[in-house]
Amino acid sequence: MRLLVLLWGCLLLPGYEALEGPEEISGFEGDTVSLQCTYREELRDHRKYWCRKGGILFSRCSGTIYAEEEGQETMKGRVSIRDSRQELSLIVTLWNLTLQDAGEYWCGVEKRGPDESLLISLFVFPGPCCPPSPSPTFQPLATTRLQPKAKAQQTQPPGLTSPGLYPAATTAKQGKTGAEAPPLPGTSQYGHERTSQYTGTSPHPATSPPAGSSRPPMQLDSTSAEDTSPALSSGSSKPRVSIPMVRILAPVLVLLSLLSAAGLIAFCSHLLLWRKEAQQATETQRNEKFCLSRLTAEEKEAPSQAPEGDVISMPPLHTSEEELGFSKFVSA
């Protein structure tokens, strides 16, 4: 168990704080956003890249862009990438965002073994490409007619009237030395006047924002995009540390392989032990058969040799003289 814990730690610790950067970046449709991924000193000379995350079951890169040498900017479509090795950072800029650009991207560094990578989410909000231009339409409420030998003044649009008063119009100069008519109360003496039929309302309600809420138009040019976009992207994001999915799944795969190897070793040892016991059993049976056949052969040979071998030599009898005399008397 301790060995597995050490192995797990060895697999996870090498990728810790290898890459740092924003977790999320966002922008409106048509904007330009820029982000910065910082890496460690030992990854200075390694190759950096930017790609979009794809795949369903297994993650893969699509549309990969590799950074060139020190300070050189590489562009592919609407994406540019630059490796600043002095600052240990990889700068990525996305131009003219579209709704299809929203998704997850990898900021990665190639190295021996699994690559160091950082997952970044891009959010694109719909918005107009340019601010709405006002198109005022003026409708004069009064007209003037020209008098003979008189310079008529151009008809001016109605002026702004006080709340609750009717709109008023200025009259033309009549005659060569005619006196100018005094302005009516509530009217303005300047040209290009506007009128409002209701108090507190705007002459263009379609283009005026509602009370209490206003959204300034956003315009980003090519010179100020790099300065304003990092502030926009970094305002709602914070640096984080990303651990690749491969490093998370690697300990599980190693554990499964160790368990399968242990099971295979136990099965093989059990199989060898069973085979050894079977061999010993066969040898024991073979020895028993051999001993039994030998005993039967010896038993068969024993009766044929028994009459000759069973003769017992008796020692000679010593008879006394009395017994000899008695035997002679009986025989006589």
From Swiss-Prot:
The chain crosses the membrane at residues 248-268. Residues 186-205, 220-239 have a biased composition (Polar residues). O-glycosylated with sialylated oligosaccharides. Residues 147-158, 168-181 have a biased composition (Low complexity). It comes from the Eukaryota. Residues 146-239 are annotated as: Disordered. GO terms for molecular function: transmembrane signaling receptor activity. Residues 1-18 form the signal peptide. Glycans are attached at residues 96, 137, 143-144, 155, 161, 170-171, 177, 187, 195-196, 199, 201-202, 207-208, 213-214, 222-224, 228-229, 237. Pfam families: V-set. One of its GO terms (biological process) is signal transduction. GO terms for cellular component: apical plasma membrane; basolateral plasma membrane; multivesicular body membrane; plasma membrane. The keyword Disulfide bond applies. Keywords: Cell membrane, Disulfide bond, Endosome, Glycoprotein, Immunity, Immunoglobulin domain, Membrane, Receptor, Signal, Transmembrane, Transmembrane helix. Residues 19-247 are extracellular. InterPro entries: CD300_family_receptors (IPR050671), Ig-like_dom (IPR007110), Ig-like_dom_sf (IPR036179), Ig-like_fold (IPR013783), Ig_sub (IPR003599), Ig_V-set (IPR013106). The keyword Disulfide bond applies. PANTHER family: CMRF35-LIKE MOLECULE 9, POLYMERIC-IMMUNOGLOBULIN RECEPTOR. Belongs to the CD300 family. Ig-like V-type domain mediates binding to lymphocyte. Receptor which may mediate L-selectin-dependent lymphocyte rollings. Binds SELL in a calcium dependent manner. Binds lymphocyte. This is CMRF35-like molecule 9. The lineage of its organism: Eukaryota, Metazoa, Chordata, Craniata, Vertebrata. The gene is CD300LG.
